[in-house]
């Protein structure tokens, strides 16, 4: 591992020299990108090397010093350095882990009310609010691609495009069944009801990764409708795209024009086709490895939200927090960061 870190540091230094001599602006940009990727690892490795030097100096003091007070201080410093070395080495191991190729991607996030009738749709709306607040805290951009409100309030489904930095690395653990336990506003007896919403997070497909021939897509237009199906305009601005080879169909009416709805529908369609490809690949990979943090499948129950007890439980890692009210205000890192750490531990154990 240390040999690998030395190679990375040497590469970083070579790139720094190249940058000083490079005149081509495009080449400079590429070099700067590569430097920024290597910089966190090199900085941490330099910290580790400094600790090694300090440790050697302390060892010398312990061998040569006679003063008991200084020896006591040196022993304390030695323990501190050893602890810092271990922490730094663990951090370096994580930085050297293979990166998920999708981690830097934007995502399309879909939320659907599932079992539990109207309460499921209300919970879907609550989840939407939470994810939007979380995205805002990260300075991510959120665009609603398609939104289907339910008749009695809440949402039957919604699809968002979330754009920004390293989004999939944070949100990829959100796919699955989210279960809510609470007393509905209409419940006169005060009984707790259980309902569910399904979340699906898919990395946004790029043109180079997925080629779709427009000859394979059927386009239908129709009038936009509101909750309950009533028509809300007289022009056919809503669009349905059907990918004939896969049978995947997407309808979109959120935009103000047919052109806007067609663009949004195509974004969703690409994502669903892409997800179909990724799911098949993931199923094959899951046959060969244990995945403690979950499969990411939409049928997997991942989390329970218990409102009467202000409790949230992530079933994949056995995490329980009495902070549901805070988390629903967008503080999702309280759950997501432990999931990331558990996934890293799993990777380290398998590497």
Curated annotation (Swiss-Prot):
Signal sequence bounds: none
InterPro entries recorded: PCRF, Pep_chain_release_fac_I, Pep_chain_release_fac_I_sf, Prokaryotic/Mito_RF, RF-1
SUPFAM superfamilies, per the entry: Release factor
Record-listed N5-methylglutamine modification sites: 230
Pfam family, one: PCRF
Post-translational modification note: Methylated by PrmC. Methylation increases the termination efficiency of RF1.
Alphabetic keyword roster: Cytoplasm, Methylation, Protein biosynthesis
Keyword match Cytoplasm: yes
GO cellular component assignments: cytoplasm
Localization annotation: Cytoplasm
MF (Gene Ontology): translation release factor activity, codon specific
Protein function: Peptide chain release factor 1 directs the termination of translation in response to the peptide chain termination codons UAG and UAA.
Family of this protein: Belongs to the prokaryotic/mitochondrial release factor family.
Protein name: Peptide chain release factor 1
């Amino acid at each position: 591992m240390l040999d690998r870190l030395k190679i990375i540091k040497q590469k970083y230094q070579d790139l720094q020299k190249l940058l000083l001599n490079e005149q081509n602006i495009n080449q400079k940009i590429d070099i700067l990108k590569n430097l920024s990727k290597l910089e966190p690892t090199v900085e941490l490795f330099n910290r580790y090397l400094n600790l090694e030097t300090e440790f050697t100096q302390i060892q010398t003091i312990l061998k040569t010093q006679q003063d008991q007070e200084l020896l006591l201080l040196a022993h304390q410093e030695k323990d501190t350095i050893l602890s810092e070395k271990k922490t730094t080495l663990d951090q370096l191991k994580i930085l050297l882990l293979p990166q998920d190729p999708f981690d830097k991607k934007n995502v399309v996030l879909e939320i659907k009310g599932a079992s539990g009738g109207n309460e499921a749709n209300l919970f879907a709306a609550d989840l939407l609010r939470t994810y939007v607040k979380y995205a805002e805290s990260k300075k991510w951009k959120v665009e609603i691609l398609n939104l289907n409100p339910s008749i009695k309030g809440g949402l039957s489904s919604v699809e968002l495009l979330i754009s920004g930095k390293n989004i999939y690395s944070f949100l990829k653990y959100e796919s699955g069944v989210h279960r809510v336990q609470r007393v509905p506003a209409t419940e006169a007896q005060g009984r707790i009801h259980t309902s569910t919403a399904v979340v699906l997070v898919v990395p946004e497909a790029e043109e180079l990764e997925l080629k779709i021939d427009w000859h394979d897509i059927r386009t239908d237009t129709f009038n936009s409708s509101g909750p309950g199906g009533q028509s809300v305009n007289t022009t056919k601005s809503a669009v349905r795209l059907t990918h004939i080879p896969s049978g995947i169909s997407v309808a979109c009416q959120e935009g103000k024009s047919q052109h806007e709805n067609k663009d949004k529908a195509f974004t969703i369609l690409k994502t669903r086709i892409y997800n179909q490809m990724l799911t098949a690949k993931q199923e094959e990979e899951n046959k060969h490895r244990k995945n403690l943090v979950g499969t990411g499948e939409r049928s997997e129950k991942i989390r329970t939200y218990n409102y009467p007890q202000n409790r949230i439980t992530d079933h994949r890692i056995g995490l329980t927090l009495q902070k549901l009210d805070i988390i629903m205000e967008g503080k999702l890192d309280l759950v997501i960061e432990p999931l990331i750490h558990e996934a890293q531990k799993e990777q380290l154990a398998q590497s």
